[in-house]
Amino acid sequence: MTAKCIMVLGTTSGAGKSWLTTALCRYYARQGLKVAPFKAQNMSNNARVVASDKGSGEIGSAQYFQALAARSVPDVRMNPLLLKPEADTHSQVVLMGRVSDALTAMPWRSRSNHVWPHIAAALDELRSENDVVVIEGAGSPAEINLSGSDIVNMRVARHCDAACLLVTDIDRGGAFAHLYGTWALLPERERVLIKGFVLNKFRGDAALLAPAPQMLQDLTRIATVATLPMWWQHGLPEEDGVFDDRSTASGAVKQTVAVIAYPRISNLDEFQPLKNIPGLRLMWVRSPAELAGLSASDWVILPGSKATSSDLAWLRAQGLDAAVAAHAGRGGAVLGICAGLQMLGKALIDPQGVDGDAPGLGLLPLVTVFELDKTVRHTQATFADGIAAPWHALAAVTVSGYEIHQGITQPQSTPATAGEVARAVLPGGLAWQNAAGNVLGLYLHGLFEDPGALQALFGAQLNGPVPTLDVVFDRLADFIELHFQPGVLPGLLT
C-alpha cells in the first residue's frame, strides 16, 4: 500500500491550513479510506500526549485532532518535529515525541540535514500503512529566504508527489495577490503540484468575486476550487501559533473566565470548549485593568507556560500579580493549570540554575522544584469528595487529561501559618486547594475537555449536551463537501 498524498499549503500563517486539513481527514475517512495526517514540523506550544506501538511522547495539538478526525490513532510519526518556543530566539526541539537536547542546542539552519531523514522515514511509513495521507504545510511555501533549508513545505510535497491545495485568507484582503505571488515565486517543478486555489473566510456573495478567479486561472492555469464562507464557531481550537485575541461570549454574559495571556502561554487550545457555553465570556488578559471589573463569581485562570519563570516575571512586571491576589482576596475563584499551579505557590526552585529560583505568587503554600526530566503522560484521576466551593461540583468526578511538565510540587516543609493549608484534591500531587477553597491548582491539562467535568461545572448553563469531537469533525466534512466544486475532492486522489 502506498498512500496518495494530499497537501494543504497556505499563503500565510493563519490562512486556514490546520482546520482544512482536519476537515479533509474526516471527509476521506467517511469514504471508507484509511487516512493519516502529517505535518513535518510544527512550531507551537499547543501539544498533546500520544502513546501507541509506534512510540510515545508529544505532538502538536493540530495533528492530534487531525488524527482523531481521520479515525486513526495519534502517533509521533504524524508530527516528527515539534518546536516549542521558549523565547523569541529559542525553541525546545521535540523529535519523534521526545525532547532532543542536541537539536535544541543546534542553530536552526543546521537542523534540516539532521532531521530530514526522520521526517522522510515517518512519512514513508505512514504512506505504506494508509490509503491517504493528508499533509499540512507551515506558513507559506514561498519563503524564498528559507527554501534552502525547507523541510516542511515543498520538499515534503516533492518527496511524495502530493496533490496540493493553496489556501488564502480572503478576509485579510489581497487574496488574489497572495495566491498569484506565492505561485509566481515557486519554481515550475513545484507549481505543477498545485491542483487548486482555495479562498477561505469569505463574507458575502461569492458571485461578486468575478472575474478575478478566472483571471487568476488564465495567469496560472490553476482553478479556484472552493470559496469557503467565514465560519467563526467551527468548534476546533485555533490554528497552531495563531492566538485568538477576541473575547467571546455566547448570549447574555452571566460569568467571565479571564485567562492570563502571558507571552509563552501553552495549551491554550484546552479552553476551546468554554467558547460554546451560553452566558460565559472567555477573555484573554494582559493588564490589571482587565481584571478590575470582575466579580467574585468570575474566574481568573493562570494557564500553562513553556517558560514558567520568565512568564511569571512578565506577570509581575505588568502588575498582574497584585491584580490576581486582589481577586483571590475578594473570594474570587483562581485556577492555575500546570505552570499556573507552579506560579501560585510560594517558591520555584531551580537546582540546575537554568532560570534561577523565583518567589511564587504565594496563593498556595506549595514549593515547586524543577527537574531536567519531563513528565509526559495521559492521566485519569478522581477529585476528592471534600473539594470545597467554588469547585465543589467536581467532588467525586473522575476526569481524564494529560500532563506535560518539568518539576515536582509539594506542600512547603516549614510549618504553615494559621489557615495556610494546601489540601490535596487529586491523588499523586495532581491538584491542591487553599483553605478558603477559592484557589485551585492542578497539573492536569484538559479539565474543560472532559465531558464529566464540563457538565459538573457548567451543567446549568448548557443547552443540552456539548457537541462531541466526532460531531465537530463531521460538520467540518459536511462544510467542505458543500463548498468545494463538485468532483474536486475525489479528483485529488486520482
From Swiss-Prot:
Protein biosynthesis keyword on record: no
GO molecular function terms noted in the UniProt entry: ABC-type vitamin B12 transporter activity; catalytic activity
Metabolic or biological pathway, per its Swiss-Prot or TrEMBL entry: Cofactor biosynthesis; adenosylcobalamin biosynthesis
Domain of life where this protein originates: Bacteria
Domain GATase cobBQ-type: 254-453
Gene Ontology biological process terms in this record: cobalamin biosynthetic process
InterPro entries with a match to the protein in the record: Class_I_gatase-like, CobQ/CobB/MinD/ParA_Nub-bd_dom, CobQ_GATase1, CobQ_N, CobQ_synth, GATase_3, P-loop_NTPase
Classification via CDD domains: CobQ_N, GATase1_CobQ
Listed Pfam families: CbiA (PF01656), GATase_3 (PF07685)
Keyword terms: Cobalamin biosynthesis, Glutamine amidotransferase
Active site per database record: C338, H445
Family, similarity comment: Belongs to the CobB/CobQ family. CobQ subfamily.
Functional summary from the UniProt entry: Catalyzes amidations at positions B, D, E, and G on adenosylcobyrinic A,C-diamide. NH(2) groups are provided by glutamine, and one molecule of ATP is hydrogenolyzed for each amidation.
Designated name of the protein: Cobyric acid synthase
Taxonomic classification: Bacteria, Pseudomonadati, Pseudomonadota, Betaproteobacteria, Burkholderiales
Encoding gene, per UniProt annotation: cobQ
